[in-house]
Design a protein with these regions (language model features):
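Hydrophobic, aromatic-rich cap/lid helix
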Residues: 69-111, 127
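Conserved hydrolase catalytic core segment
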Residues: 1-30
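The alpha/beta-hydrolase serine catalytic core
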Residues: 32-65
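Conserved loop-alpha-helix segment in the C-terminal half of the alpha/beta-hydrolase fold
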Residues: 115-160
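Catalytic histidine-centered segment of alpha/beta-hydrolase-like enzymes
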Residues: 156-170
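Short, amphipathic alpha-helical "lid/cap" segments that border enzyme active or binding sites
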Residues: 169-177
Length: 179
């Protein structure tokens, strides 16, 4: 979205970035090795008997236990495709998701941010505490990100995680629509 807003400013009236995966500036100067994360994501279970089996597997597991149950149900219902052999597989295969992590630092958004004049609202969850183990639920968003936009507003949501749209869809939808 940041790339589109910078390239096509007349096409976007405002931006709402929901706990965006925009790393601190220095991360793009010295890209980290995400191979461990990519490898872990790439090994995620891909085969399921069906949406009910997937729901039962995830409903009590972190981070899915944080999600609104109706959202988790929709994820399980609509996030699977028939595998052609009577079972189901993830619509976004684990290797495809892993490639997102592997290439996440290939485009530095920071030079683009200074060219965005539209109002930008950043919805942000808590970052991982120093010394804690990596958790996909923690925010990758720098607390000062909104300040870097010409017209930026930071909305810190300490009771939510990186999965905020799945945790509290009504609240996030209202913030997107009404600011």
């Amino acid at each position: 979205l940041v790339q589109v807003a910078a390239a096509l400013p007349d096409a976007i009236r405002k931006l709402v970035l929901v706990d965006p995966v925009i790393m601190p500036r220095e991360a793009y100067q010295r890209p980290s090795d995400f191979s461990a994360t990519s490898e872990m994501v790439g090994k995620r279970r891909n085969s399921w008997d069906g949406p009910d089996a997937m729901f039962e597997r995830f409903r009590d597991r972190h981070p899915y236990v944080l999600w609104d149950p109706a959202v988790l149900r929709d994820y399980c219902e609509y996030g699977l495709l028939p595998d052609g052999e009577g079972g189901f597989e993830l619509a976004c295969p684990p290797k495809t998701e892993a490639s997102v992590y592997a290439t996440s630092l290939t485009v530095d958004p920071w030079p683009l941010i200074e060219h965005i004049g539209q109002p930008v609202t950043v919805l942000r969850a808590p970052q991982i505490a120093p010394g804690k183990t990596f958790d996909f639920a923690s925010s990758p968003t720098p607390p000062t990100l909104a300040d870097s936009f010409a017209d930026g507003t930071d909305i810190y949501l300490p009771d939510l995680t990186h999965f905020m749209p799945m945790q509290d869809p009504r609240r996030i939808a209202e913030l997107i629509i009404f600011g």
